[in-house]
Swiss-Prot record:
Pfam families: EGF, FXa_inhibition, Gla, Trypsin. It catalyses: Selective cleavage of Arg-|-Thr and then Arg-|-Ile bonds in prothrombin to form thrombin. This is Venom prothrombin activator oscutarin-C catalytic subunit. Expressed by the venom gland. It is found in: Secreted. Keywords: Blood coagulation cascade activating toxin, Calcium, Cleavage on pair of basic residues, Disulfide bond, EGF-like domain, Gamma-carboxyglutamic acid, Glycoprotein, Hemostasis impairing toxin, Hydrolase, Protease, Prothrombin activator, Repeat, Secreted, Serine protease, Signal, Toxin. The modification 4-carboxyglutamate is found at E46, E47, E54, E56, E59, E60, E65, E66, E69, E72, E75. SUPFAM superfamilies: GLA-domain (SSF57630), Trypsin-like serine proteases (SSF50494). Its main location: secreted.
Amino acid sequence: MAPQLLLCLILTFLWSLPEAESNVFLKSKVANRFLQRTKRANSLYEEFRSGNIERECIEERCSKEEAREVFEDDEKTETFWNVYVDGDQCSSNPCHYRGTCKDGIGSYTCTCLSGYEGKNCERVLYKSCRVDNGNCWHFCKPVQNDIQCSCAEGYLLGEDGHSCVAGGNFSCGRNIKTRNKREASLPDFVQSQNAILLKKSDNPSPDIRIVNGMDCKLGECPWQAVLVDEKEDAFCGGTILSPIYVLTAAHCINQTKMISVVVGEINISRKNPGRLLSVDKIYVHQKFVPPKKGYEFYEKFDLVSYDYDIAILQMKTPIQFSENVVPACLPTADFANQVLMKQDFGIVSGFGRIFEKGPQSKTLKVLKVPYVDRHTCMLSSESPITPTMFCAGYDTLPRDACQGDSGGPHITAYRDTHFITGIVSWGEGCAQTGKYGVYTKVSKFILWIKRIMRQKLPSTESSTGRL
């Protein structure tokens, strides 16, 4: 019985062997999912073959040095290695506004185009008023995380939300008769057209006027106003702000008993009573101190009388605008300080005196003068430069235009619109090297000017007021 049982067990074992084989051994296709054979590197002829990135790093794992041997270039190796180690971080195009992505190990770097910043170039810089004025043509105001553009009076905001479109033929600050190429050729010489502080010249010469200035052609300085006395002699300048308001210097007000205004003229040699505009009311800044009695305009200087040196004339009848008579635009304080006064140049114009105590120039002159750094301005002056003043001009020329157009305009152009930035006020000496023209800083008085211009007073007898 026992031999029969043993035989049965042996037969059963032999019968089960094929089944066991099918359970232990997998088909090659299935087995390759789990087991992969790597081709052996550095075979007998490996070192004699040129580098191949597929053989070195794709078919087998390679080191950075091995990759370097293939590329033979550090930059190409670095680019490959950053992707090889952990994939391409730039594949999702993380850099906005056409920024350029550079992959790194576990990171990436965006190189932004001009005007954009942030890790992903996601911040548009011109949405800050501090950068290119927010791309606004006139005024820029920050609003939460954005900016808001607006325009000077008489202009409409363009559909793009940045540009300003003139709403009429005689909108402020428009130089209708453009200077074309003459603008670029305006002389870069300082002629501080003021000479309130004067020393007598040893050799007065008829050539000393707005030195190297150019004639301002008809319509090129349309905001220029001239203050004349009862004899129609010009004694100060002014700037047209609106049909009934003209800006000037406060120290001009006490120079004559009667003030009339002339506009639209480039030659004042001919008397013409019909062109005179009567002044209805005069507003002098409340902090301006008039010169003392017995004050001689050319020989004495009282600094107190030149701080807050600003006044506004109100006309009895409106000024008629034309292509030769246009007001200058009034800026906001921020726009003037942060944009206009950071330009290279301003433009001054006037009928400057020919020489010290000499007659006025009969033709209107214009020139551009650079803004002067405040610290340099203060160091150059023996008299204090107050916060209501700024300097413009050069320090190297030995001549300037003594006793010119006090009260006249200092204009700064921005995107083809001309804004009032200063009033010709005073200067130390005449033709002195290292000295600059000093101007009333209009940005300090924007609210004061607007408060006066909002008034609509009935016509009254000519009078002088203080506000």
